[in-house]
Amino acid sequence: MVTIVLNKYKLLNKIGIGQQKLEDLLFNLKSEIKPVDESNIEIEINADRLDLLSSDGIARAIKGLLEKELGEAKYDITDTEYKLIVDNVRTRPYALAAVIYNAKIDLQELIQFQEKLHSTIGRKRKKVAIGIHDLKKIDSKRIEYREVPLSYKFIPLYEKEELTISEVLEKTEQGKLYGNISISNGVSPAIVQEDGEVLSIPPIINSDKTKLDESTKDLFIDVTGTSFEAVAQTLDIIVSNLAEAGGTIGRVKVIKTDNSFQQSSPLLIHKIQNVREEYANKILGIKISEEEICKHITRMRMNCNVENGIIRVTVPQYRVDIINEIDIVEDIAMSIGYNNLEPSKYISTNYGSYDYLTLLERKMRELSIGAGFVEVFNFVLIKNEKILDSKYVKILNPISEEYNAVRNSLIPILLDFLSKNQHAKFPIRIFETGDVVIYDSSTDTGFRNDKRAAYAIMDNKVSYEDVQAPIHYILKTLGIEVNYKEENNDIFIEGRSASIVYENEKIGVIGEINPDVLIRFGIEYPTVIAELYITEIAKKLNKR
């Protein structure tokens, strides 16, 4: 959910209803109201409804439910002489722009709208950043988006003196928060006038030159980012909501310097989504006609018509949450009102139960405890430096470097556990069962989940046989007669390791840990480990 704060009286006046009616209609739109003070309300909005993140977007939607306005909202659009020349900006290659004329602007609400878009579709400005400028303070109709050196100077928003971009990164709060997103190789993306004067350094900060004030009515809006689709959608939403406030949308000619793109912006992208009458009725559990379906769709501010028995919905540019047929059906439910839909009873002829893999894992845990091992629980994520195999899943944006990869074996994580518990009373006998993600070229992703169990013993003196005996007992109790086939593995001492084989298939490994591996983990005592592949064992046993 996304939370916005709006002036209650301004919103009610825009729609022409009372607060209770507003609460009821917002509930239909999956939103809730909480009072903040006498004048302001807090509204929780579903994160996919970006068009509702301002009072104008909310008013547009509710006017549809009230049938004051039906179908897609129509806005005044005009061509302008403004051009945005887009150069090769390596860290944020995509940019679009638009002009808004004569909009009724609430500065506080506009800034909130901008920041909520930054935090949602913009992924905290990493994916999309928005610059909003007072159009009358821009001196040229040719605007450029290009890279500039960090020595480039301009006056940042709310500052009095010129700073270099390097100084902005060091001295301003915005620079500290967002400077690492787009700076690379000593250059930064920049929106500049034809004479080179900076208008903004996306995604960090605007220039003070084009600062908005209470007299601002005309806007120049730039949107930059790493995804063209997200950039286009963001700009479409902004200009649509500002046009709802009475503004006229001005098109800007966007031209790539390599001539790979030349188009008027905003794109105002519409799409056609077909809906089947029988599908909608089945999902909703009701019986309504094609005409009734179309009526509800127009109440949700989309156009609808029926052609040869097919319901065609024109999805406007501000409804980026509509992806496929089920989203249209959800909108029909909102128009009808969830309170007006009767919940159907779920009747099942089956009953739930654990699958065989889960039952086998539970049985192995019981047997492992009975064999004298203590169960430990570790995270599925691990530091990649601790992984002993080169084929693993690495996380591109980890919260911590300690958890930047997904484990592909339980052996490293048990060794890591032992390294931190060498002070404990010997012998240390531990085991863990859990998921790993292993390389598999036959899958769509190249990896698959696997369930495993691993056993480790650390003592002043310990050998292969100390772990083989309990493993053999556990497997035999499960009705599994295995063979041990010598196998050399860098993890283990040469000649002191084996693969565990059942019905000619490898179901595990066992051995004495190589001293080099022990040194790598900071372990000072001999250690033996076995790992069993529960998923493979389950496949074998389940066929019996």
From Swiss-Prot:
Domain B5: residue ranges: 268-343
Record-listed E.C. numbers: 6.1.1.20
Gene3D superfamilies: 3.30.56.10, Bira Bifunctional Protein, Domain 2 (3.30.930.10), Phenylalanyl-trna Synthetase, Chain B, domain 3 (3.50.40.10)
Catalysed reaction, written as an equation: tRNA(Phe) + L-phenylalanine + ATP = L-phenylalanyl-tRNA(Phe) + AMP + diphosphate + H(+)
GO molecular function terms attached to this record: ATP binding; magnesium ion binding; phenylalanine-tRNA ligase activity; RNA binding
The gene coding this protein: pheT
Cofactor(s) annotated in UniProt: Mg(2+)
The species this protein was found in: Saccharolobus solfataricus (strain ATCC 35092 / DSM 1617 / JCM 11322 / P2)
Residues engaged in binding Mg(2+): 321, 327, 330-331
Entry protein name: Phenylalanine--tRNA ligase beta subunit
Subunit-level organization: Tetramer of two alpha and two beta subunits.
Matching Pfam families: B3_4 (PF03483), B5 (PF03484), tRNA_synthFbeta (PF17759)
GO cellular component annotations of the record: phenylalanine-tRNA ligase complex
